[in-house]
Amino acid sequence: MVEPAGTALVGVAVWGQNLYNSWRPRKVGIYGAAMVGKTTLDRYMTTPGEMEEIPDEERTGHMRLLGKYLLPKPTRKRISWKGDRRVVFSADLGGQERFWSLWIDDMVARQVEVVVYMFDERAFKGGDEALQQIAGFKYLVDCIINRQYRYRTLKSRWKGKKYVPRLIMLVANKADRFFDENAAMLWQQNRIGEHKVFDPFRDDLVRLQKAGVPSRRSFMATRIGWNVETTLIDLLST
């Protein structure tokens, strides 16, 4: 028989943990190649709702100063889903190859605890777009494993020497374009990591595991708001 006092203490502890998770600011880095949905996710986290297809001319870019691209400042978002809440600070970074070094600068300078790498169905269709998405993840993994960080300040250099993100989340975005019967079955069985959409990234996921960096996988469809809040709240509860 469970003692009432013990039950009450457990309830208070759970309530306290939920309250802590609801208000603690979480630093999240959202990276990925061009046109995979990073800006859509950034806008959706800021204000959920019906999202437009972002035109090419509005793709994220960055100004240069003295030969360096300027890092955008992170903005605060508040994510809510069925009573759970999280406060997230993230920045919208470009996905073109010339901006990849900014991912690392942002990650190290802010000491992000969770990295979300986004890709879409083009990654397993071949061609230049697939190569960019796969190469972007490999670049990110190389930098994390080998700690090939660039430091913009002495403070970031001091912090970066021992820095490794707590978790890497590989997100297959635009799931509405590839979610088939097999995906539905794997989803129900909590085995989505076995879906073929993740095949191009498996070697680098293994490298992360061997290096002691945990990784997870998920589906999203940011433009229609499917599985966005669920994924992020679950990610920030671990």
Segments from the language model and where they lie:
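Short acidic, S/G/P-rich loop/turn micro-motifs used as interaction or catalytic elements
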Residues: 36-37, 96-98, 121-126, 175-179, ...
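Glycine-rich phosphate-binding P-loop
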Residues: 26-52
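Switch II (G3) loop of P-loop NTPases
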Residues: 83-103
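Conserved catalytic network of the ASCE P-loop NTPase/AAA+ motor domain
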Residues: 71, 79-84, 106-112, 150, ...
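Conserved C-terminal guanine-recognition region of P-loop GTPase G domains, centered on the G4
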Residues: 114, 119-209
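Switch I (effector-binding) loop of TRAFAC-class P-loop GTPase G-domains
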Residues: 46-87
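Conserved GTPase G-domain signal focused on the G5
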Residues: 37-38, 178, 218-238
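Short, flexible boundary segments at extreme N-termini or domain junctions of P-loop NTPases and their
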Residues: 1-33, 152-153
